Amino acid sequence: MARYFRRRKFCRFTAEGVSEIDYKDVVTLKNYITESGKIVPSRITGTCAKYQRQLARAIKRARYLSLLPYTDLHK
């Protein structure tokens, strides 16, 4: 009986000691959105609730200012 152990998820922002997530940091924000432009949930990324809220707010601001696309699937 082989048991599969998942690697424990951790909040990258807490580990790095980030005080606030910046909406201008597009490279970091792109890691937390899917190919279709949706925000990846914290149960997938392991981000804690405090930083997930900041992340969502930063992504929405970046979209509004056209730093990030709303979707990548424009035809």
Curated annotation (Swiss-Prot):
GO terms for molecular function: small ribosomal subunit rRNA binding; structural constituent of ribosome. Disulfide bonds: none annotated. Keywords: Ribonucleoprotein, Ribosomal protein, RNA-binding, rRNA-binding. It comes from the Bacteria. One of its GO terms (cellular component) is cytosolic small ribosomal subunit. It holds the Pfam family Ribosomal_S18. GO terms for biological process: translation. Coiled coil: none annotated. Belongs to the bacterial ribosomal protein bS18 family. NCBIfam families: S18. Part of the 30S ribosomal subunit. Forms a tight heterodimer with protein bS6. Binds as a heterodimer with protein bS6 to the central domain of the 16S rRNA, where it helps stabilize the platform of the 30S subunit. This is Small ribosomal subunit protein bS18. It comes from Psychromonas ingrahamii (strain DSM 17664 / CCUG 51855 / 37).
